[in-house]
């Protein structure tokens, strides 16, 4: 039908506020300020929160499948889907093997100086959110913006860190092809790291794990510990989180 879709050509805060008062329902996808404005508008609203999906790579998993799935997910639409992996937590006894698999799959590991430069591009320290000009940028665009050089065939840039604090850019949501990487001594520590990252940066959103699919005890421990609406096992989180092809148990939606 005519006029079923319309938009504001030159958006402003005043026009957005006016629009929110004139509609029957608001579906608010955006920053915290915009979601808060929607909830305060007097119009029924559904707000979408940030995702800070951490993925545990357990020593019982198929490493090649796990790494390939994460890269497949993280590179779709340059990582813009909010259910996409933001960092991985790897058990110590397989850490080097997993790292090598990422490297062999054309992921680039940043040193500290490079990581700091990239962080200035994507991370807004005041809001702990993503800078708007970094959304959905390709690896090469991000590298150019940061003033660093990476191989032209790089799929994802990765930074190894042990800092899970909310002030660490790499511990937060990154809606572009960037990953943080953590090492855990054992499964218990992996649960601690994953739970902290998910809760502080994306409570109620998504968490994932790659493991032996028959290990129900481990899967149950993970599911009960994570404060997330979507618990994904052996699944690329971008696709598993939005439902359909990789997860028919969830109704398809790009608004999470």
Model-predicted segments: where are they?
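Glycine-rich phosphate-binding loop
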Residues: 26-38
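Short acidic loop-to-helix transition motifs that present clustered carboxylates
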Residues: 9-14, 33-34, 214-216, 238-240
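A structured beta-alpha segment of the ubiquitous adenosine-cofactor-binding alpha/beta core
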Residues: 5-23
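ALDH superfamily catalytic-core signature
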Residues: 35-165
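Short, structured coil segments at secondary-structure junctions
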Residues: 22, 41-42, 226-227
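General beta-strand structural signal in soluble alpha/beta enzymes
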Residues: 3-9, 27-30, 45-48, 110-112, ...
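A glycine-rich phosphate/pyrophosphate-binding beta-strand-loop-alpha-helix module
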Residues: 1-3, 217
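Conserved C-terminal structural/oligomerization subdomain of aldehyde/semialdehyde dehydrogenase
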Residues: 148-256
